[in-house]
Structure formats: C-alpha cells, structure tokens
Amino acid sequence: MKTFLFAAGASIPFFENPTLTTKYLTEKVKDPNEWQRVITKYKKKKGESVVIASPQFVVEVINMILSYVPDANFEQIAEVLDKISSYSMDPISSNGMMNLVQRVLMELKGCPHNSLGIGMQEIPFLFREIIAEAILELERNHKSKDYEQLLKKQNAFIAHAAKDGEASIISTNYDNCVPDSLHGLGFDTCFRPVNSRYLMQIDIHSFMNAPRVVYYPHGHLRFHFTDNDNVTYWHDSIMANNERWDGLASSAIGSTLTVTPGRFAYNFNTFITTGQTKDDSFNHLPYAIYYQRMACDIANSDTVYIIGYSFSDDHFNRLMKPFLKLKDTNKVVIVDYYPDALGMVDEYMDQNNIISKICQVFGTEWSVIYDSARQNKLPFNQSEVQKLNKEGFGEIFKNVYFYKKGYYDFLNEFTKFI
C-alpha cells in the first residue's frame, strides 16, 4: 500500500502572481480591507443590528499579536483570535480550562471580570472565510499558465507511484489541486447522500474499507460544517462557500456557526482547520474517522510520499514516528525545495532545518565521520550526498529519500527516481 501526504508546498506550483503560500494567506488575514469586507457581508446576511466586533477592533487585536510576534503567520494569529473569541462567547470559569486560567490571571492582576471583546464569537468563522475566499480568488484569477498540465502530471505521478494497488491520499490543503487531479484513478471521498437536510456526508463504513480514498484532515473549501457535528460535502467550492454564508441566516442546511467544546477552549475549526492546536478537531466528524484511517494507512503502507510538508503538525508527526521501525523495507520519499547544498553534517544543529525535523520525526540516526587527516566532518554516506546535490535526489537517512529541487521539477522527472 502507498500513502501520499500533500501539504502546503504541493500547491505552490499551481498558482502564480501571487502564489498560494503561508505568507500570502497571512497578509490576507492582516488586511483591514478584508475585515471590512467580511464583516459588512456578515451584517448583510444577519441584519445591520447584529452585534459583532468592528473591523477596527479585530485589526487592533491582530496588530497587538504582531507587536509581540512580528513574524506570526496566519495559523498563530488564528490561535489567539480563537481563544479570545472562545472566552468572549462563554467566560464562565468552569466551562473550559482557558476560562479558568483567564479568570485566575484577572484576579492576580486585579482586572474586572469582563469579556475581552464584544461580538467576537463569529470572528473565527470570518477569519476562515478570508482564507477560503482568498484561495477561491486565486483559483479564479491566478492559476499557473500550465495549471492543466500540472494536474495531468500530478495524476501521472500518483498513478505511477500507486501502481494500481491500494493507496490513500491525505491532503492538508484547502484548494482543489488534489481533487481535480484524481480523475480516472479510482479515489473515493466516500461522501454519500444521507437525507434532504444534510445531503452528502461521510459514509464511515465505505471510507474505512475503500481500497483507494482521498481525505482532508485539515478541512476543505468544499466543506460546510453542519449542526449534526459533521460536514456536508459539495462538489463545487463556490457553491459550498455560498452555502456557508447562507447558513448564517439559517436558510441553508445545518448551522454554519456551530462550535463545539474542546478540552481547553471552544473549537472553531469547522469547515477548515487552522491554528496551532488542531487536535480538538479530531473529536468531530469527518475528522475523527480521518484520523483513524490515517493511522491505519501509515501503519499499513510500505512507502509514504510526503510533498511540501513542514513537519510542524504533531498529530501527523506522531503517526509517522514508528513507521520505519514497523518493517525494515518501509521507505519514505520526501519532496521539498531546499536551495542550499546539503552536507548531512551540521544540519542537525538547527532545529528548524527540515532535515533536522525529518531526523526527529522518523527517529533516524545522524551518522557523521570525522576525517582526522583533514580535521573535518564528513557525511556517513558521501556518495549519496554528492548524488543528491548533483541530481537533486538521494538517501539522506536509511530508507528516507529526499528530493530537493521542489515539486514543480519533481513532476517533470519523477520517473527517474521512483
């Protein structure tokens, strides 16, 4: 069995001017004009008299976050806004550990026990809509000139690597680059008609038993969260977006603004999951069954292909950690963009270096030879490192293969390496 993990870097080649990156989405959620737009749109749906935080207040909070962490990305900003919104919605100290911590801190500082902001409850949804609509705008106006060719190449890569056997595709990306590239390959989302209210929702039996599945553990533009603690799946992202907005006026299925209790605070991760504590999402459908299938897929695979992943999500990392120890023949193929020459000697000293992260996640050994004649350190497998720097592909640890030239180049030459 083969498992594919498509993460943020896998979508970059499909868009241009601008590209779909963390930086691009961060700039969008920081933009005062975006907050003015979505809050105005929200009021049109709910009525002008609705109580909601002003765009100016939301931007002030974001700027305050950035004053402490100037390089905060959109996930870090989401984390803080979600927690503020959780307390604003329900400040009772017995209703969540965050509320209790907040109340104790207020007592220690002699602060009044009031909410941190009026009308913040819907801000997490609007934050996620800024992200969703930014991606929809990219899909409308900024696709790469060879977008269709890239879809065909991605299709060919998956077909070549999966070799007609059982396979699972896990995508953390909200866009349509993965689903649009799977035509003819037999991958199933396993969303099935349920009733006239919820339309298409996950069929758990089909999903857990399908030989080929594709799933989105961080949510997707095609998802619409509903009031039965699940999502409805739409085949069209624009229609899904319209339904989410219509859900504000209760004219569509379910309840767009459904939130669920979490262990620490309320969980606002609904149709897409962001922030830095995503684990609460896996207590709700379809994410709960996604996580179960993901654990099974990784454990049952002989090869895992990882495209454009930063190795920053603990809920993925913990599932991959034992993979190489399950069978001596298991292997990992990682595709990323690494412009510098690889030495495989000192990279471990930088904990943020992707090579260092790979070593930590898979529990591999970092082997270095000391050349006493030259008084310097050399990689254990010198020929493989030389090949990697020359050709772009090589074995960096036992059974861990790395392609360093980026996903665009990989799609043009994957048959040379796999």
What are these regions (language model features)?
Residues M1-K28, P32-F57, Y68, F207-N209, ...:
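SIR2/sirtuin-family catalytic core signature
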Residues I12, L151-N155, Y174:
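Conserved glycosyltransferase catalytic-site signature
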Residues K44-E129, A156-N269:
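Extended, H/D-rich, highly charged conserved domains that either
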Residues P70-I77, M89-I92, K109-L116, I135-Y147, ...:
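Residue-level signal for secondary-structure boundary elements
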Residues F125-L151, P261-S301, Y305, Y309-D313:
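Alpha/beta-hydrolase fold catalytic core
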Residues K152, R192-I204, G254, P286-A288, ...:
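Short amphipathic alpha-helical surface micro-motifs
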Residues Q154-N155, V178-P179, D313-N317:
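Short, well-ordered alpha-helical microsegments
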